[in-house]
UniProtKB/Swiss-Prot annotation:
SUPFAM superfamilies for this protein: Bacterial luciferase-like (SSF51679)
Disulfide bridge positions per record: none
Role this protein plays: Catalyzes the desulfonation of aliphatic sulfonates.
Family: Belongs to the SsuD family.
EC number: 1.14.14.5
Catalysed transformations (reactions): an alkanesulfonate + FMNH2 + O2 = an aldehyde + FMN + sulfite + H2O + 2 H(+)
GO MF assignments: alkanesulfonate monooxygenase activity
Organism for this UniProt entry: Azotobacter vinelandii (strain DJ / ATCC BAA-1303)
Keyword Ubl conjugation listed: no
Keywords: Flavoprotein, FMN, Monooxygenase, Oxidoreductase
UniProt-listed CDD domains: Alkanesulfonate_monoxygenase
Name of the protein: Alkanesulfonate monooxygenase
InterPro entries membership: Alkanesulphonate_mOase_FMN-dep (IPR019911), Luciferase-like_dom (IPR011251), Luciferase-like_sf (IPR036661), SsuD_RutA_monooxygenase (IPR050172)
Length: 382
């Protein structure tokens, strides 16, 4: 099975280390453009753009980067409860048309009650999923050419429709991640690709089985993806040293403060991430080559695959054997790590290439020509 590999735009900040301004860099439009263009050239299928009050607006970032990229797809956040589903569908269709069919959408229900209250959303966890289900039914329906009437508990629309359809039919693909039962049911009924954060394979297998069974009861099939950081180096020893350096500036006080902030979240996925590391820098390898260090201070995806190219590829293939076909990866700092992933990891994967990308097993630069006319030996592939 060919794998789809996406990268990540760090609109909330970037740098060499977690928890310190040392080695940090300004994340402005020029820098985001560098990352997007690198991902485009290197053969990543798309980029995830995060959402939340700590991030730049994902829609505006995507719109600004579409003209300076050629094939790259942009996975943009949909926020039920924050915007009308009909307006969101119109925006989605416009972005899809103007990008030439390069728009993907990520349904985000939110997990921080404090942030959600600041955005005017005062719903419980269960109510947010009720509202998200109503939102998604309308959003998918109008994008698919239907005229939608819905009198829901949270949303009511009459005669909702679009005049200008999206390029991707019946609608641009809808991604979604969540770990609660309500999230699994929403995924089974409404979404095209279910994303999980990087838990050990056995836990991921359980989630996939549950979503797959629920989808079957709705007469549907769902694709699966996983969101992971990655630390890949020429040797596994170098990769683990890089992991240690990434959290080398974190002290117990910083970790405790971050974990206290994350503890207010009602996200089941966030609770599962926290359980992997327990707020401690000890015993962070929670599964072979799966490291939970990022989650000590970062909300959301908190685990990384660590190793040399063949080792990380082998772990990815273990997830693929469970049914995962899409990997959304990231690494610090994101510009440099995009090249490391392309050069050290891509040769060991069967990649689904974006349209128009051709290469000799990898899209990254093949090296300097020797003696004016001799091409370097091709990298070993597994």
């Amino acid at each position: 099975m060919s794998l789809n590999v996406f990268w990540f735009l760090p609109t909330h900040g970037d740098g060499h280390y977690l928890g310190t301004a040392e080695g940090a860099r300004a994340v402005d439009h020029a820098y985001l453009q560098q990352i997007a263009q690198a991902a485009d050239r290197l053969g990543f299928g798309g980029v995830l753009i995060p959402t939340g009050r700590s991030c730049e607006d994902s829609w505006l970032v995507a719109a600004s980067l579409i003209p300076v990229t050629r094939r790259l797809k942009f996975l943009v956040a949909l926020r039920p409860g924050i915007i009308s589903p009909t307006v969101a569908a119109r925006q989605a269709a416009t972005l899809d048309r103007l990008s030439g069919g390069r728009a993907l959408f990520n349904l985000v229900t939110g997990g921080d009650p404090e942030e959600l209250a600041g955005e005017g959303l005062h719903l419980s966890h269960a109510e947010r999923y009720e509202a998200a289900t109503e939102f998604t039914r309308i959003w998918r329906g109008v994008l698919s050419g239907e005229t939608v009437d819905l009198q829901g508990k949270h949303i009511q629309v009459e005669g909702a429709r679009l005049l200008f359809p999206p390029l991707q039919q019946p609608h641009p693909p809808l991604y979604f991640g969540g770990s609660s039962e309500a999230a699994h049911e929403l995924a089974a009924e409404q979404v095209d690709l279910y994303l999980t954060w990087g838990e050990p394979p056995a836990a991921v297998a359980e989630k996939i089985a549950d979503v797959r069974a629920r989808a079957a009861r709705h007469g549907r099939t769902v694709r699966f993806g996983i969101r992971l950081h990655v630390i890949v180096r020429e040797t596994t020893e170098e990769a683990w040293e890089a992991a240690d350096r990434l959290i080398g500036h974190l002290d117990d006080e910083t970790i405790a403060k971050a974990q206290a902030s994350l503890a207010r979240f009602d996200s089941v996925g966030q609770q599962r991430m926290a359980a992997l590391h327990g707020g401690s820098k000890e015993n962070l390898e929670v599964s072979p080559n799966l490291w939970a260090g990022v989650g000590l201070v970062r909300g959301g995806a908190g685990t990384a695959l660590v190793g040399d190219g063949p080792t990380v590829a082998a772990r990815m293939k273990e997830y693929a054997a469970l049914g995962i076909d899409t990997f959304v990866l990231s690494g610090y700092p994101h510009l440099e790590e995009s090249y490391r992933v392309a050069e050290l990891l891509f040769p060991h994967l069967d990649l689904a290439r974006p349209a128009g990308v051709e290469g000799r097993g990898q899209v990254s630069p093949f090296g300097e020509v020797l003696a004016n006319d001799i091409l370097p030996k091709a990298a070993a592939q597994s």
